[in-house]
Amino acid sequence: MVLRVKKQTKVENPRGYIAKVVDELRNLLTAGARARRDPSRENFYEVENAKNVFYIHISPVTGNVVLLAKWPGQSQGAREKAKNATA
């Protein structure tokens, strides 16, 4: 699925990530980001780009995005190796 938000959407940062990380997420979501819905939590998603995975919540009331966690993503090469190892 692809998630896209308006440029003026507020990105909340309760964990205090540096501004560069918040800007990276905002730019990713504004452009349209590949995302996976958390099957056990409504309105929670993993959003990723080439470098990072972001765990976010999108408020159904305000539309605000809450950045809850960030971790390094897998490179395309690592994904291919994992895919081939399980095939």
What do these predicted regions represent?
Residues 52-53, 57-87:
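Enriched for short, Lys/Arg-rich terminal
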Residues 23-49:
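A short, surface-exposed loop/turn module that caps and links secondary-structure elements
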Residues 13-16, 45, 66:
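Amphipathic alpha-helical recognition patches that constitute DNA-binding helices
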